[in-house]
């Protein structure tokens, strides 16, 4: 008798994507992050669901309801901090996942890559709206500053901002709709993840060498299920150390002050995972230019497949490109640091140079390095 997992309509889908999936025999730990992102998403949806049971999306009670969750709800504090720090873990995995794709040329699967970019935007939007919900000072002013950026759009900008606000400032209507969007988006993300995997399983996974692995595939289970469990245990360990020992390490103290429209915090800054984009935004003295640079800092990923000039897919055997890749990593860390600093000398010029270098590396230097490497192969 044929195994039921191979014949049952539902079990067959799970079997083909998690059990009998042919996977390259040489994929490294860098390929763990896809499953880790799935775990993060499930964790965020579950903790978020329990938080939503006790949260009220009203300007007068939002801040108090979060305090109530932490003080009065059974294990509310751990659910709240797992949700807040789970977002940080989510973004760490996201950045590493995208970095892996850049390094090993996974962007040569265009559908998978483009849906990944849409997913990145969706997760960033969800995280931004979630940060507004506790209705602390940084929530309120972050929402005000970021939504205000849309007013830079010519002609329709001001109307668009007021439409998003549901009034003439960030208020009750804004908070309510942000809660609604923050609740629905993770389910949209889940659907996009399914499409992301659908396209990935059409081609099969890439591998570190960048060479087709059709002649040397192994079943996903038990090899990579066991390998993924190690990644999951590591992720959960780091998350729980963060949650149980220093839950506010990555947060902003200003968010423990209730939102006050009459008092602006000295330094308005987003969560750490948006600081690189915030630094790029601030490095341009023009409002519209800054907004465009902010969007392009992520959207630039979409043109990377078009700029692939190398004869090899992966950077594994391309030392020049490797140097530029790690320079890009250092540049992003610099931008993250600058994003959290006040707008004054010398941070302004460092931010501007780091922003120029970011776009130069991705759009100019890396394609040129690939051409040089192609020519070196002829020697």
Curated annotation (Swiss-Prot):
Main location (coarse class): mitochondrion
Cofactor note: Binds 2 heme b groups non-covalently.
Annotated keywords: Electron transport, Heme, Iron, Membrane, Metal-binding, Mitochondrion, Mitochondrion inner membrane, Respiratory chain, Transmembrane, Transmembrane helix, Transport, Ubiquinone
Domain of life: Eukaryota
Membrane topology listed for this record: Multi-pass membrane protein
Molecular function via GO: metal ion binding; ubiquinol-cytochrome-c reductase activity
Protein's UniProt keywords contain Membrane: yes
Compartment(s) where it occurs, according to its Swiss-Prot or TrEMBL record: Mitochondrion inner membrane
Keyword Metal-binding: yes
Transmembrane segments: 33-53, 77-98, 113-133, 178-198, 226-246, 288-308, 320-340, 347-367
GO biological process, one term: mitochondrial electron transport, ubiquinol to cytochrome c
Chain residues that bind heme b b562: 83, 182
Cellular component aspect of the GO annotation: mitochondrial inner membrane; respiratory chain complex III
Residues noted as binding a ubiquinone in the record, renumbered to the chain: 201
Binding site for heme b b566: 97, 196
Cofactor: heme b
Subunit structure as annotated in this protein's UniProt entry: The cytochrome bc1 complex contains 11 subunits: 3 respiratory subunits (MT-CYB, CYC1 and UQCRFS1), 2 core proteins (UQCRC1 and UQCRC2) and 6 low-molecular weight proteins (UQCRH/QCR6, UQCRB/QCR7, UQCRQ/QCR8, UQCR10/QCR9, UQCR11/QCR10 and a cleavage product of UQCRFS1). This cytochrome bc1 complex then forms a dimer.
Family: Belongs to the cytochrome b family.
Function: Component of the ubiquinol-cytochrome c reductase complex (complex III or cytochrome b-c1 complex) that is part of the mitochondrial respiratory chain. The b-c1 complex mediates electron transfer from ubiquinol to cytochrome c. Contributes to the generation of a proton gradient across the mitochondrial membrane that is then used for ATP synthesis.
Extra information: Heme 1 (or BL or b562) is low-potential and absorbs at about 562 nm, and heme 2 (or BH or b566) is high-potential and absorbs at about 566 nm.
Protein name, entry field: Cytochrome b
UniProt source species: Hydrictis maculicollis
Lineage summary: Eukaryota, Metazoa, Chordata, Craniata, Vertebrata
Gene field: MT-CYB
